[in-house]
């Protein structure tokens, strides 16, 4: 697997397999928590479900992110757009056209005032700016409707609807800290090049758990944006050859 070049049939199979696994795991755990979980009787299980959904929600966003770069199904822009929009809908009802436009701007102007992901001040202020960039009036109108509809369908279990928005919010914090703030914050140390991005240098297990390698290998991502998340560690080990 490590000897293939990105975009080969083998890589596409791996991309689609991992994408399907993340989507399926999220859907199964989402359905379980909303319809079957007894949080009062099993509080530890409820916490584990929340943690699992948070990590899988990060995974949904990463699927959409890779789709933006055309790396889920290389050479198939419509397939990437469909998969990316599905992942964003499940994550928080976000708009694919809006996010892909802003993300491409981020890559062109990373770490500058023209970067929609870049912010000034401390991490809390920067996070607020980061969220407001992607969470607009459309999401502000759509999400309450979805949550209310969910609550009505759940009936007596209406409180379990929190297992959709809460993991999404926690995931956004996780994505921001490990995928934006740590890699792009100025003044911490010198950036290696014009991409104004650094890799956090944490080990591969933590890199996977925190942000599907987009923190641990963020500079590598800016150097090789079409490399899918699971191949990012390979780019460093091979000196840039994915």
Curated annotation (Swiss-Prot):
Tell me where on the tree of life, at the top rank, the source sits: Bacteria
- Catalytic activity of the protein: all-trans-beta-carotene + 2 AH2 + 2 O2 = echinenone + 2 A + 3 H2O; echinenone + 2 AH2 + 2 O2 = canthaxanthin + 2 A + 3 H2O
Write down the top EC class of this protein.
oxidoreductase
Q: Tell me which InterPro entries the record gives.
A: FA_desaturase_dom
Q: Kindly state which keywords UniProt assigns to this record, in alphabetical order.
A: Carotenoid biosynthesis, Oxidoreductase
Q: Does the keyword Oxidoreductase apply?
A: yes
- Keyword Signal listed? The answer is no
Q: In which pathway does it act?
A: Carotenoid biosynthesis; astaxanthin biosynthesis
Could you mention a single GO BP entry for this protein?
A: carotenoid biosynthetic process
The Swiss-Prot or TrEMBL record annotates one GO molecular function as: oxidoreductase activity
Give the EC number. Answer: 1.14.99.63
The protein's role, per its UniProt record? Converts beta-carotene to canthaxanthin via echinenone.
**What is the protein's given name?**
Beta-carotene ketolase
Q: Read off the lineage from the record.
A: Bacteria, Pseudomonadati, Pseudomonadota, Alphaproteobacteria, Rhodobacterales
